[in-house]
């Protein structure tokens, strides 16, 4: 299945278009299946999208929405590095969503303490609770993600054990190339069970990785190449990030 590409003049325009599209996609998912399962991401574009979505909050029946995370820094709950904390400031504190439908990953000062693997397993078990019988994860309606200049997505970095994982849906990451070193991440297995995967990428520094991912590079070396949805794979790019896409 080929990916779809939308190119925007700048990152601000890209984020606004993504927010509008996400609000509409949530509405469609609720109409079709009575709920929407969305995987959030951090980073400048991911948090910018959440700020935009907060302005569209009245368009969405939040009582039918479940929010998950693609990855998280395994740091204390109130640490500013937490994707969850940034999401609360940008979106969650401004909408009327039932707390039981917000599913953050465990924090480093939580019940699992230093046991990163137990924390990852607990999140994997949580995902299974929302899946159809016999399946390890639900079919997320949208998995949002950014991409690093070397092609990493979530906390799946090039040529690491996590990006090569073939059975687990969620794993712990130690010695991350990007600080902080300890993280929890959904694997490519989980990502690929999403109906739609959206990659939001901006900036010249990421143009080479965008071109490599879209050109069929191995996912072990360019993890974004493995970010493929069951129905839709959508690249939302600014002109700088799109500059090296072939033809």
UniProtKB/Swiss-Prot annotation:
Record's catalysed reaction(s): 6-phospho-D-glucono-1,5-lactone + H2O = 6-phospho-D-gluconate + H(+)
One Pfam family, short name: Glucosamine_iso
Enzymatic class: hydrolase
Molecular function in Gene Ontology: 6-phosphogluconolactonase activity
EC number of this enzyme: 3.1.1.31
InterPro entries: 6-phosphogluconolactonase_DevB (IPR005900), Glc/Gal-6P_isomerase (IPR006148), NagB/RpiA_transferase-like (IPR037171), PGLS (IPR039104)
Keywords: Hydrolase
Biological processes, Gene Ontology terms: carbohydrate metabolic process; pentose-phosphate shunt
Pathway entry: Carbohydrate degradation; pentose phosphate pathway; D-ribulose 5-phosphate from D-glucose 6-phosphate (oxidative stage): step 2/3
The keyword RNA-binding is assigned to this record: no
Keyword field contains Transmembrane helix: no
Domain of life: Bacteria
PANTHER family, alphabetized: 6-PHOSPHOGLUCONOLACTONASE (PTHR11054:SF0)
UniProt family annotation: Belongs to the glucosamine/galactosamine-6-phosphate isomerase family. 6-phosphogluconolactonase subfamily.
Role noted for this protein: Hydrolysis of 6-phosphogluconolactone to 6-phosphogluconate.
Protein name: 6-phosphogluconolactonase
Species this chain originates from: Mycobacterium leprae (strain TN)
Gene of this entry: pgl
């Amino acid at each position: 299945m080929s990916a779809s590409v939308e190119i925007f003049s700048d990152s601000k325009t890209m984020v606004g278009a993504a927010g509008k599209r996400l609000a509409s996609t949530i509405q469609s998912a609720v109409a079709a299946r009575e709920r929407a399962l969305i995987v959030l991401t951090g980073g400048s574009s991911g948090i910018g999208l959440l700020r935009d979505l907060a302005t569209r909050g009245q368009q969405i029946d939040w009582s039918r929405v479940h929010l998950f995370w693609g990855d998280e820094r395994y740091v204390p709950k109130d640490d500013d590095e937490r994707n969850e904390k940034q999401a609360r400031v940008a979106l969650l504190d401004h909408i009327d969503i039932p707390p039981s439908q917000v599913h953050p990953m465990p924090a480093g000062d939580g019940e699992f303490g230093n046991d990163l693997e137990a924390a990852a397993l607990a999140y994997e078990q949580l995902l299974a609770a929302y899946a159809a019988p016999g399946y390890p994860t639900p079919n997320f309606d949208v998995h949002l993600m950014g991409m690093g200049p070397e092609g990493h997505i979530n906390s799946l970095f090039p040529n690491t054990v996590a990006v090569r994982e073939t059975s687990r849906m969620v794993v712990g990451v130690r010695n991350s190339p990007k600080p902080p070193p300890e993280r929890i991440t959904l694997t490519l297995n989980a990502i690929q069970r999403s109906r739609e995967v959206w990659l939001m990428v901006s900036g010249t520094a990421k143009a080479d990785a965008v071109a490599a991912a879209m050109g069929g590079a191995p996912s072990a070396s360019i993890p974004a190449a493995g970010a493929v949805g069951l129905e839709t794979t959508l690249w939302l790019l600014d002109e700088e990030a799109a500059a090296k896409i072939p033809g």
